[in-house]
Amino acid sequence: MKAITLLSSGLDSVAALAIAAEDFDIEMAITFDYGQRAREREIEYSRKVCEYFGIEHRVIKLDWLSEITSTSLVNRDVEVPSLSFEDIGEAAPAEITDASAKAVWVPNRNGVMLNIAGSFAESRECEYLVVGFNGEEAGTFPDNSLDYVKAMDRAFFYSTQNGVKILAPLIELGKTEIVRRALEAKAPLEYSWSCYRGEEIPCGECESCVRRARAFKNAGVKDPLLERLGI
């Protein structure tokens, strides 16, 4: 079976690609440039991941999406929230992660990306779109949830002739389990980039960095990216 993967170079999308590649023929990876702060890192690292797997890499620019996005993920005049392990713990007030999610929200981003990727999948007669949606982020980002996957599958039933479906191998997993499964699948995590800020090295403070750090700590392994960068 053939698939196209959405690849941001983040921990989740790289893990999902590696897991899917065990059973599917991955035709192409698509990375989106919507003006996000980390776009240069994401594109660079996604290219390296695609070289590792020997698959085609396509970058699609969405300039209009950056124009209508005012949050910190795109707008450098708005500060990206800094969090700690305590802020993302089970005992932490939901207001903290809700505020962080709102600060990096991009209007209908996943919906836009999935529909574009769905067009490519249909045109190439691919049955599946691989995504890194996961159980941990679904709590604060509803467009990472199983309900969302089911809704998009239903939409693709009507909007694609071949009934493209979403393959979300991480949909029930937390970040720690994702790290373990990614390592089992020999995912090139040394070329996975999670930081929202997109500087030369990960900031270690944004929500994405903190969730990643906690996952590797709980998994009892060193982060291959930080090892490669000498951090």
UniProtKB/Swiss-Prot annotation:
Transmembrane segments: none annotated. Binds 1 zinc ion per subunit. Keywords: ATP-binding, Ligase, Metal-binding, Nucleotide-binding, Zinc. ATP binds at L7, S8, S9, G10, L11, D12, S13, V14, A15, A16, L17. It is an enzyme of class 6 (ligase). Pathway: Purine metabolism; 7-cyano-7-deazaguanine biosynthesis. Its EC number is 6.3.4.20. Coiled coil: none annotated. It catalyses: 7-carboxy-7-deazaguanine + NH4(+) + ATP = 7-cyano-7-deazaguanine + ADP + phosphate + H2O + H(+). The keyword Zinc applies. Zn(2+) binds at C195, C203, C206, C209. The keyword DNA repair does not apply. Its cofactor is Zn(2+). GO terms for molecular function: ATP binding; ligase activity, forming carbon-nitrogen bonds; zinc ion binding. It holds the Pfam family QueC. Catalyzes the ATP-dependent conversion of 7-carboxy-7-deazaguanine (CDG) to 7-cyano-7-deazaguanine (preQ(0)). Belongs to the QueC family. This is 7-cyano-7-deazaguanine synthase. The lineage of its organism: Archaea, Methanobacteriati, Methanobacteriota, Stenosarchaea group, Methanomicrobia.
